[in-house]
């Protein structure tokens, strides 16, 4: 059947990939039913890292974030991202905790740019890269909560292909935005043709339930607001008094002239637009300045001052004119002097409309300049500060960039996932922002040298960089307040420029005018703000070794040398979809799935073992006996003794595979 929607195709799209060597980005094509691809690895828990929180000090100010409870339910894994994702989605204990529970996924995958990085093997052929990413995206989709989102960080090499791949996996209707990050702070002199300044971050929702948090308002956002009239509602700014009209064939009811009470001029909304408010709402404000009434319709003037044709002008929409033009000017001036103006107000020559600060922040914008979220050079400085001048990555990401992503896509206590940990920036920022996190790293050298040490520093408050602290805010320090429209940042810049201009003129420095200007623009910086004080913890884990392999020369599935003891038990349990029973509780059986109990025998399954196991179960329970060798008659004996039970021969009954097609 022909596909009914647009899809990206590539070489071997119907195949799967397995690593050719543990701990590297090298892959081999295999059939999707090959046990080397299908095997579910478990997580082997190593040590648990516990941090400590630094008490508060009078030396600093503290943000609300500094008081968040440090999260301790975090997971740091050494292992290949695909195998880790399979463990998180397939191992019952992990699936229960993470499937459908992850609020935000951020990945900064290998860009496939054919560059040679010290910590990344990034030169993956396009079809391999697409297959690698497709399989991982399908697992990530299972992990995402219904209101979650995925953020994929890319450069020019694979961005266009990844967009189509994300459409295929998540649905094009769930596309949210393509965010553009200005990663460079200067042009590259070694660029061959163009110095690329940006990366892109593709964001997709898990479903229509996904909601993006709004951005907190900054001092710059609020700088345009003032209160020149003593408005009882607080600060405001003069916004556009006109609105675009979508009525093209006839006159909009709010397209008419208003006579100005002071100048007497007939004023119209902007061409192609209408007044922002309806007639009654406008009159409610205008009548505070002078009395208004409906006037005649001047067709010629209306055509000249709007985008209307004469045949579109409506005679039933009159202009608003002054009842007593002679007294209107004085009445209007008096009302202006009284202050606390209405929402549609009169100025000396025109009209204005008040707009108040929104109660909540503003929507995130898709352009992220480096002065807001940092750049590559800033990120490298953060790494150098943590690791004695080392530069382990060519393109690290600044903490401020991850801070914005995590703020927009999650809330404190939510789970954040990154399966390409690198230096651990995502987990570090998530911890500092009160989120739970799961991250994994493929390369053991990166894991032991950078990822884990960095996260340990974060927990022990030994990482003062990144988003840990914020410079104190620049605030007004004048006696009478800064002039309207002048922010503390504006005043500080003015003072800096003024000092440069007069630095070589001692007399000018002493002048009354300069001293007056400095006094009128005086600012100060508040205490440095601490956003993170350490604390929390994380579990360290690594992937279990493979227990199942395929021998092409024999064309059969084999058990590996690692398939022994508890490793074998846990592998069989996971691959059969059972949940482990705790070995310390002296259970006879190893695992349970509903009413079925699993026993793994590394050796021969006999009728005597079956009889013994049957004596240990309760009515209604069944037995799954997995053994490396099964004696004749054992299967029939178990089925007869305990209905619904079965024997699993290892490895053949777990993975039936043959390149000849007998699967």
Question: What is each residue range found by the language model?
Answer:
Residues 75-76, 377-415:
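Glycine-rich adenosyl-nucleotide cofactor-binding module
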Residues 441-663:
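PRPP-dependent phosphoribosyltransferase catalytic core
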Residues 1-106, 111-127, 131-135, 139, ...:
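DnaQ-like (DEDDh/DEDDy) 3′-5′ exonuclease domain used for proofreading
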Residues 84-92, 105, 110, 136, ...:
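Generic, well-ordered alpha-helical scaffold segments in large soluble proteins
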Residues 207-384, 388:
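Active-site-adjacent helix-turn-beta-strand microarchitecture at beta-sheet edges
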Residues 3-10, 20, 126-130, 147, ...:
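Conserved S-adenosyl-L-methionine
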Residues 86-149, 157, 173, 198-200, ...:
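SAM-dependent methyltransferase catalytic-core segment centered on the flexible catalytic loop
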Residues 146-147, 157-220:
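Signature of N6-adenine DNA methyltransferases within the class I
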């Amino acid at each position: 059947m022909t596909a009914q929607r647009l899809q990206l195709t590539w070489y071997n799209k119907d195949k799967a990939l397995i690593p050719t060597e543990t701990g590297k980005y090298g892959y081999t094509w295999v059939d999707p039913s090959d046990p080397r691809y299908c095997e579910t690895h478990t997580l082997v828990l190593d040590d648990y890292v516990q941090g400590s929180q630094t008490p508060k000090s009078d030396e600093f100010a503290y943000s609300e974030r500094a008081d968040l409870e440090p999260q301790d339910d975090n997971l740091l894994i050494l292992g290949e991202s695909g195998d880790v994702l399979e463990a998180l989605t397939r191992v019952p204990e992990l699936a229960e905790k993470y499937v459908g529970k992850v609020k935000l996924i951020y990945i900064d995958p290998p860009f496939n740019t054919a560059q040679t990085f010290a910590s990344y093997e990034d030169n993956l052929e396009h079809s391999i890269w697409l297959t690698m990413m497709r399989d991982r995206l399908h697992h990530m989709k299972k992990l995402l909560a219904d209101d979650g989102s995925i953020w994929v960080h890319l450069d020019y090499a694979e961005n266009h292909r990844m967009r189509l791949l994300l459409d295929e996996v998540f649905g094009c209707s769930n596309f949210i935005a393509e965010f553009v990050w200005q990663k460079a702070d200067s042009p590259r002199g070694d660029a061959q043709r163009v110095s690329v300044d940006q990366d892109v971050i593709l964001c997709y929702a898990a479903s229509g339930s996904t909601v993006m948090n709004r951005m907190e308002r900054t001092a710059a956002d609020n700088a345009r607001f003032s209160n020149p009239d003593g408005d009882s509602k607080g600060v405001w700014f003069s916004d556009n008094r006109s609105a675009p009209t979508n009525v093209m064939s006839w006159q909009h009811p709010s397209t008419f002239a208003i006579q100005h009470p002071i100048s007497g001029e007939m004023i119209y909304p902007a061409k192609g637009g209408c007044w922002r408010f309806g007639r009654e709402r406008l009159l409610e404000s205008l009548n505070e300045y002078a009395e208004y009434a409906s006037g005649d319709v001047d067709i010629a003037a209306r055509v000249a001052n709007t985008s209307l044709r004469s045949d579109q002008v409506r005679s039933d929409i009159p202009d608003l004119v002054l009842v007593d033009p002679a007294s209107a000017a004085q009445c209007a001036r008096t009302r202006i002097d009284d202050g606390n103006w209405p929402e549609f107000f009169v100025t000396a020559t025109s009209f204005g409309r008040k707009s108040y600060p929104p109660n909540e922040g503003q929507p995130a914008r898709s352009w992220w300049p480096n002065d807001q979220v940092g750049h590559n050079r800033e990120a490298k400085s953060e790494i150098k500060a943590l690791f004695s001048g080392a530069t382990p990555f060519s393109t690290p990401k600044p903490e401020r960039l991850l801070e914005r992503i995590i703020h927009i896509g999650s809330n404190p206590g939510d789970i954040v996932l990154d399966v390409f940990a690198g230096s651990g920036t995502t987990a570090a920022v998530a911890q500092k922002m009160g989120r739970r996190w799961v991250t994994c790293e493929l390369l053991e050298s990166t894991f032991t040298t950078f990822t884990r040490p960095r996260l340990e520093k974060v927990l022990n408050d030994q990482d003062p960089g990144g988003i840990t602290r914020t410079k104190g805010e620049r605030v007004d320090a004048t006696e009478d307040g800064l002039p309207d429209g002048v922010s503390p940042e504006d005043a500080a810049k003015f003072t800096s420029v003024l000092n440069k201009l007069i630095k070589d003129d001692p007399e000018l420095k002493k002048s009354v005018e300069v001293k007056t200007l400095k006094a009128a623009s005086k600012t100060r910086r508040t205490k440095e703000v601490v956003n993170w004080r350490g604390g929390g913890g994380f579990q360290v884990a690594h992937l279990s070794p493979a227990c199942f392999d395929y021998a092409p020369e024999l064309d059969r599935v084999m058990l590996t040398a690692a398939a022994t003891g508890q490793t074998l038990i846990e592998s069989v349990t996971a691959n059969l979809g059972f949940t482990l029973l705790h070995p310390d509780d002296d259970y006879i059986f190893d695992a349970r799935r509903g009413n079925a109990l699993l026993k793994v025998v590394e050796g021969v399954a006999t009728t005597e073992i079956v009889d013994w196991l049957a004596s240990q179960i309760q009515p209604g329970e069944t037995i799954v006996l997995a053994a490396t060798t099964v004696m004749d008659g054992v299967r029939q004996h178990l089925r007869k003794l305990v209905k619904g039970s079965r024997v699993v021969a290892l490895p053949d009954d777990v993975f039936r595979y043959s390149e000849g097609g007998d699967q």
